[in-house]
Amino acid sequence: MERNIPRAAIHVGTDKKSFSSQVGNEAERRGWDEKRYQLKNADIDKNNHYNYSRKRLNFEIVKGGKIVPLGSQSVPLHERLQHRLDELGFKPYMDAKRPDQVSRNSPNCTVGIIFSGDHDVLNRLAFGEQKLNTSDPNADHSKVVLQKGIYDWALDTYRFACEKWGEENVIGFDVHCDETSIHAHVQTVPVEQVKKRGRIGSKYIHKDNPEKVLSTREWRALPKEERDNYTKSEAAKGVVERVSYAKVWGERAKDKSQYLSQLHTDYYNKVGHKYGLARGFSYDELSEEEKRGRKHKNKVVLEAER
């Protein structure tokens, strides 16, 4: 496989049993002033390159595909996630010894995905001919103007995520332009649709008046000569939504590996190729040497090396 060509990148974070306000606030940069940026960059072990002057370029995409400044939604990410879980009737298993904490046996309820790609390609989409060093956290980029190309890429990626997991299950779509490489954080709830259990009774509809509908019991109570005025209609079973990481991402490691591989292929076909980005590689598609090199690296280090 040829590797020295511009490629899309998809990084699937660790599946979560819970989601804190701290994690959500970082994704949405809530409460991040200049001092906060300096403190983040002071942690040399994490190789951070946050640039405060580019904070204003960050944006998010909300329901309906509307682009707004990052962190402008009145309800923060962790609360939106909880609201969706409540809608789905999801209740985590709580730890018997520590009732205020979620048990290790609780099902995973949210998955974070980072969409990105070749550093130069995304920088060109975002900044055009403007020259800037995105790895310099102290550079003054206050006059940099974000270009249309990055909005197009983000919207296409948002539509892809909504098509894949359902717009109502895409809880956050945050695009960061203040780090070394531009990327989109997508926070999702894994949801499957299942048919309702139990028997569904038939309906009897009047031939001349479709609005007149009887249950089986009501139809049987009619005189025999009147029953002929109705036609039988089988009621379709409805569906219910429920949180299920295993049904969406795979029940076994092999299933998840296949899902991730297909995710890369689908993203290339729907989005990547439009922006000159070749198909990316899932972890299982890397060589053993590449796996060893990436195994203990965090997101920021990988971004800095792109």
Protein language model regions, located:
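N-terminal nicking endonuclease/strand-transfer module with a His-rich metal-binding environment
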Residues: 1-306
